[in-house]
Amino acid sequence: MKIIKGKKCDWEMIIGLEVHAQVISNSKLFSGASAKTYDSLPNTQVSLFDVAMPGMLPLLNQYCISQAVKTGLALSCKINNYSAFDRKNYFYPDLPSGYQITQFYYPIATDGKVVLEESNDKEVRITRIHLEQDAGKSIHEYGKTYVDFNRAGVALMEIVSEPDLRSTDEVAEYLKKLRMILRFIGTCDGDMEKGSFRCDANVSVRPLGSDKLGIRSEIKNLNSIRYVVQAIEYEANRQVIALENGEELIQNTLLFDVILGETRVIRNKEDAHDYRYFPDPDLFSLEIDDQYISEVKLSLPELPIQKRDRYIRDFKLNKYDADILVADRDVAAYFEEVVQKHDAKLAASWIVCDLFARLNKLGISINESAVKAGDMIQLLDLIVDKTISGKIAKQVFAIMFESGKSPISIVNEYGLKQLDDGDSVSVIVENVLANNKDKVLQYKQGKEKLFGYFVGQVMKETQGKANPELVNSIIKEKLQE
């Protein structure tokens, strides 16, 4: 809980979130038009139904139902056997039919939860998950407004939480956890920059210790977790100042100005009756039987927290590494392919430290990496069988990442194979000791830290290719003579 220090008393935030998650699907919710619209030219992924041409009827995409059921199960929801679609009536240029098809009365899923481990295992209740159409997009340029209907009709899951959140830290954790789960089960890509994971935040404040809910404001269409946090903090503080100054709050719908860092009113908040909801007469109700729910449940992958706990239990990984490896489904798959051939801790270290450092620097995903799981396996093979040293492996990996070449070809091309010939290493050690007689004398007089200096000189002479264990052994032997 975050306490806001007021002039008259302490206040607490009351926050509920409505997340609009775009369903991963080839086609839209009620038409055959493509749902992959982000990079498309305006109005090129549009069917006659999407722009409400007369006589066009909706045809329900069953795959979107499956995706919503899968999401509900992953969030511990009750999947309702009966569900139906309704019309939400309002007028806006990017809504050509004058209504949005949604699920007001009978959502697909209810009564779920998300557990926030970093917030003392706090449970945030999920009120409902329902399917609905996305609207088009209004583009304002040069004093004119254009409408792109590519997005119109794309399937959204609206995931509504109870007002259980009490701080922006909890909000950020909730959104990250929810996004991770949806990505992992393959129902939403969670890309906030592309608008496929958007958030509306309902914010109110009340005196600390009160159980009465205050007048809330709804902040619409927040498309980054950072902006969600900034918007909520600004709005909560604005409400506290207003209340302490004796002002009466009005239920409003707000936008967040990311440049000014403040909220502004776009309209008075509507209630349900303002939208005149009624059942859509063009769509049958849904009967979702228990057998279908069981089949969808069987298709669920191992969820991130379950997978993380298994990594910690079976592979003895620390929580930090395990959390990183399960944060993305593709990363977990990469790790599991490598760990079939190599020690889990060795694999995790190379993926989390070396691979991720380069991926993050370039801002690319693991699927875009030139170093595939098979290449990582080969590199670790070379380390384990002592073909190359760990130090040389770092050089090999850097070249692999830049060129896409296999590790063995790089080792052969650059002559990086580890020097294991005892006689050759012995000659180099003798030369190093002969050139540092004063340090040898100091070592024998008790300055044992110089041992590392001798090792470093030998590795320098061999350009890091000498077997470190062999070097240590021979130096010890020579210093005892």
Swiss-Prot record:
Transmembrane segments: none annotated. The keyword Ligase applies. One of its GO terms (biological process) is glutaminyl-tRNAGln biosynthesis via transamidation. It comes from the Bacteria. Its EC number is 6.3.5.-. InterPro entries: Asn/Gln-tRNA_amidoTrfase_suB/E (IPR017959), Asn/Gln-tRNA_Trfase_suB/E_cat (IPR006075), Asn/Gln_amidotransferase (IPR018027), Asn/Gln_tRNA_amidoTrase-B-like (IPR003789), GatB (IPR004413), GatB_C_1 (IPR042114), GatB_Yqey_C_2 (IPR023168), Gln-tRNA_amidoTrfase_suB_CS (IPR017958). Gene3D superfamilies: 1.10.10.410, GatB domain, N-terminal subdomain. It holds the Pfam family GatB_N. It is an enzyme of class 6 (ligase). Keywords: ATP-binding, Ligase, Nucleotide-binding, Protein biosynthesis. GO terms for molecular function: asparaginyl-tRNA synthase (glutamine-hydrolyzing) activity; ATP binding; glutaminyl-tRNA synthase (glutamine-hydrolyzing) activity. It catalyses: L-glutamyl-tRNA(Gln) + L-glutamine + ATP + H2O = L-glutaminyl-tRNA(Gln) + L-glutamate + ADP + phosphate + H(+); L-aspartyl-tRNA(Asn) + L-glutamine + ATP + H2O = L-asparaginyl-tRNA(Asn) + L-glutamate + ADP + phosphate + 2 H(+). The keyword Ligase applies. Heterotrimer of A, B and C subunits. Allows the formation of correctly charged Asn-tRNA(Asn) or Gln-tRNA(Gln) through the transamidation of misacylated Asp-tRNA(Asn) or Glu-tRNA(Gln) in organisms which lack either or both of asparaginyl-tRNA or glutaminyl-tRNA synthetases. The reaction takes place in the presence of glutamine and ATP through an activated phospho-Asp-tRNA(Asn) or phospho-Glu-tRNA(Gln). NCBIfam families: gatB, PRK05477.1-2, PRK05477.1-4, PRK05477.1-5. Belongs to the GatB/GatE family. GatB subfamily. This is Aspartyl/glutamyl-tRNA(Asn/Gln) amidotransferase subunit B.
